[in-house]
Regions:
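C-terminal amphipathic alpha-helical interaction region
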Residues: 105-110, 115-164
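Periplasmic-binding protein-like
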Residues: 248-254
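Polybasic, low-complexity intrinsically disordered segments
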Residues: 542-543, 547-554, 559-580
């Protein structure tokens, strides 16, 4: 079980062993400090010949546990003696799987490949299956094994044989991939989307199968679905579940970036991905392909170029000028996305982006300052937009959408701007033949509109706009993906008399040496939603609940009845004010 946590948390280092990305020069210091990297330093120490007694003296970890880790480290050395996957005998392969080695890790130690390793992973998988080495499916017993319990709470293991359940083969079933561990960038918003997709599938008579591993989520409550696989959201494990269940298809567009990143891999293995084609997902996620598509459609965007060499990028920067934005592909929450103001920052951030997005291109684009950012959340069917929501950021562009204060419906954009945004969004939806949820982010200055990016999945603002609009976008999207009937809204559904404000909460005060300056990478850990009949009224309690309170008082200019009404709200929230 010690092998799963690093993989499940999507930690940058998914094995216990040394790599080019992680190496400790002062091992004694790392071992003596209880950090999140200490387990990796223990593995390195064992590989370098440290005894269990010495590691125990430095870490104070019980020798029994250290001995179990030593077994894993020693087995890595055994796997490294083979040069071909086909040479691994059945007993060695089975023991490796019992010890928690993934197909990815076995391929790495035997073949020492480079790149995304998809081909090598599949070679290990094929060899393993040819020897009949498959994971068993067991029920999680929620009552301390006092007696057998017939729950649908499942996990996979190689330590035993046999299956505790019968599979839904040839039945009407669908797999929904969840959002994984809560962390900055992926939280309850995506879990809301996953739960609503599962509930909609059940309403339509489907057997719903959820794959997720976060015990804090609603989606991992086994009452939510017909079958819950409490297991990692890796390519290997998802294929294992699909091989056993043989569902009608897989929904990858409601769990955030993790499932979205699996779309093309599943497609290449002939797994039916429901909704928008994985080919279209790749055209949107791949920065180079998407920017080229916008140019082809004649849709305006900030000047851009693909990273080919540092010299060419610097030539591009000389033309457009600083600042520029470095943007890797297939990343969550703006990971390794940075604004560069000089050559030194450019070189450092390009290197960082290339490390995070090794398989896909990095794009450098002009960064436009003092512009408004606008979001278009929508659901489409066969390229036709069915329902949508246009919201605006209070902050200027450059603050991640997950950190920005969001106002819906947008209150301060020109009518011509809104019309242009809808036209562009319909063009993109048609070109990508979208069937399901999607989100497009725009820059606007005066009546000039430019596209930033498009995500062919539910965004973190889907719950927000669904609640404000009183239309469940995920239910509509799921019905479309399952070819089920749905209610198409009329134009009056988008003409509402209230305003929603979503503000972010941050944990800077609890994080040592945290930088409180907001940027293009996400930092917030929580969101607050309030409703009102004009923007200032909902905004005041929103600010109150984010703990951003004035130390003295708010200077309040009384101009109009709406300002007078705000004094009542200020008083009710305990916020002091003075008249001006």
């Amino acid at each position: 079980m010690i092998r799963r946590p690093p993989r499940s948390t999507l930690f940058p280092y998914t094995t216990l062993f040394q790599s080019d990305e992680l190496h400790f020069d002062d091992l004694d210091r790392e071992l003596s400090r209880p950090t999140d990297l200490r387990i990796f330093s223990i593995a390195q120490a064992m590989e370098e010949g440290y005894t269990i007694e010495r590691i125990h003296d430095l870490t104070k970890i019980d020798p029994w546990f250290l001995g179990k880790l030593k077994n894993i480290v020693d087995y890595k050395a055994k796997l490294s003696t083979y040069n071909k996957v086909e040479d691994i005998p059945a007993d060695v392969m089975r023991e490796a799987k019992i010890l928690g080695f993934s197909d990815f890790q076995i391929a790495r130690f035997v073949l020492n490949p480079t790149g995304n390793m998809e081909k090598e992973n599949l070679a290990v998988r094929a060899h393993r299956k040819s020897m009949g080495i498959l994971p068993a499916v067991k029920r999680i017993n929620t009552i301390a094994s006092e007696h057998p319990e017939l729950t649908n709470y499942l996990y996979m293991t190689y330590a035993v044989e046999g299956y505790d359940v019968n599979y839904y083969k040839n039945e009407k079933s669908v797999v929904v991939l969840g959002s994984g561990a809560y962390r900055i960038g992926s939280s309850v918003e995506f879990d809301w989307c996953s739960v609503n997709a599962v509930q909609t599938a059940r309403k339509l008579g489907y057997k719903s199968i959820m794959i997720n591993y976060n015990p804090e989520t609603v989606s991992t409550d086994y009452d939510m679905c017909d079958r819950l696989y409490f297991d990692e959201l890796s390519f290997e494990r998802v294929l294992d579940v699909i091989d056993l269940e043989q569902p009608r298809g897989v929904i990858v567009s409601v769990g955030g970036q993790i499932p979205n990143n699996l779309a093309m891999k599943l497609y290449r293995q002939s797994v039916p991905v429901l909704g928008t084609s994985p080919i279209s997902i790749d055209r949107a996620e791949n920065r180079n392909k998407f920017s080229a598509m916008l140019d082809q459609l004649g849709i305006d965007q900030p000047a851009w170029m693909e990273l080919t060499s540092l010299e060419e990028v610097k030539g591009f920067v000389e033309k457009v000028g600083y600042p520029v934005l470095v943007r890797p592909s297939y990343v969550l929450s703006g990971a390794a996305m940075n604004v560069c103001y000089d050559d030194e920052e450019l070189e450092n951030f390009l290197k960082m982006a290339a490390e995070v997005s090794k398989e896909y291109p990095v794009v450098v684009s002009q960064f436009l300052e003092n512009t408004k950012e606008i979001e278009f959340d929508a659901v489409a069917q066969n390229g036709e937009v069915v329902e949508y929501a246009i919201s605006e950021h209070v902050e200027f562009a450059g603050v991640h959408s997950g950190d920005a204060t969001l106002v819906f419906p947008a209150q301060k954009i020109y009518f011509a701007t809104a019309r242009r945004i809808k036209k562009i969004s319909r063009q993109i939806a048609k070109e990508l033949n979208i069937s399901g949820p999607f989100n497009i982010q725009f820059l606007a200055r005066n009546n000039e509109v430019k596209v930033i990016e498009c995500n062919l999945r539910a965004s973190r603002s889907f719950p927000f706009v669904s609640k404000v609009l009183k239309r469940n976008f995920i239910e509509t999207a799921t019905r479309i993906m399952l070819d089920a009937p749905y209610s198409r809204p009329d134009k009056s559904a988008f003409d509402i008399d209230w305003i929603g404000v979503k503000a972010s909460q941050f944990s800077f005060s609890r994080l040592h040496k945290a930088d409180p300056v907001l940027g293009v990478d996400m930092s917030s850990t929580r969101h607050i939603l309030t409703l009102g009949h004009n923007t200032p009224l909902p905004d005041i309690p929103t600010i109150h609940h984010t703990d951003v309170l004035p130390h003295q008082s708010i200077q309040h200019g009384l101009v109009g009845l709406d300002k007078l009404a705000q004094t009542v709200v200020l008083t009710s929230q305990g916020i002091p004010f003075i008249y001006a």
